[in-house]
């Protein structure tokens, strides 16, 4: 195994996931605000699942997506 190739591959994958995920979330929020489905001040629980079938890896990461700083004046 080439550690450098492995590490570069992981970084490229995670960068792609991060950029693509952010874009999807931004579009979903914009669409929901436009449709008046949300007010734009919510906090949403979020979960990301990482799976690599060949390694029998399944890891879940829980967090939240906030649309506004708590207690901020509007």
Predicted regions and their residues:
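N-terminal intrinsically disordered, cationic/polar leader segments
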Residues: 4-11, 27-30, 39-74
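Acidic, low-complexity intrinsically disordered segments
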Residues: 14-17
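Compact soluble domain cores
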Residues: 19-27, 31
